[in-house]
């Protein structure tokens, strides 16, 4: 096999959204390095999450299904960095890897999409809601316990196609993904973060590399969006304190204004029958502590049997 002559090799999934995100990172890196974009290679890697389409992520082991094979390529040197939807990254990264940078966050809110109603509240009684996200399921059922939740897997385009084919009455998707794909015309209603708290790191593009690769880490520092990285660090520390995975309905969202961090978090039972939420605020330098303490407090408040 011919040796790559690329300045950098970026590992990415092959879905349309993943490629849009990887190309955005490549463009930023090329500008920062003063090289042509074609000097930075995109290496498409198929992940377990891409292969498994008939079961939910919770059934198959939760977070990491969309990153495992890419992280293996990082660790064995086949790629120099990896681009992920930050919300798909495992709570604890494999040893030797680091979340080195984030691009500026896109709108983190969820959108309601349906041809039968203008909002979640207006769906007919016992309507079918298609989602593979336990967070979306729990928050939706908290408001509408009559809904029938149907697992809906696949990339954004696949889920929209299934909705349009009448397989479900409605679905919920990330606004960020629709925007990046130029598909916002499909959004029926944008849910406010107050009514539908986003997933941890939703809307953020995370860039992962090896801890010992100083050259790449230094390069990534030049394209990092500090406020996004601070918010994501706060949210991920909340997730880690809860031992969170795709098996657990968890939501968390941090915002940065000047030196202040505001954080909101939520845990729920999958059927929405019980939930606990929390808010915290403090200085941005304490963002990780704010998230961690919020997670510990909710874990204590909910009790050891909450997720059983």
Set out the residue ranges of the language-model regions.
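Small-molecule-sensing regulatory modules
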Residues: 2-46, 52, 59, 67, ...
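Short, structured active-site "lid" loops
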Residues: 54-80
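Non-catalytic, solvent-exposed segments at the cell envelope interface
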Residues: 62, 66-67, 71, 85, ...
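Alpha-helical segments flanking ligand/cofactor-binding loops in enzyme cores
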Residues: 72, 120-121, 160-161
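Short, Asp-centered acidic motifs that coordinate Mg2+ and/or phosphate
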Residues: 79-83, 169-170
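Short beta-strand segments
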Residues: 84-85, 113, 130-132, 172-174, ...
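A conserved helix-loop-strand patch within extracytoplasmic ligand-binding domains
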Residues: 86-87, 95-147
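Short glycine-rich anion-binding loops that position phosphate/pyrophosphate groups of nucleotides
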Residues: 86-89, 176-178
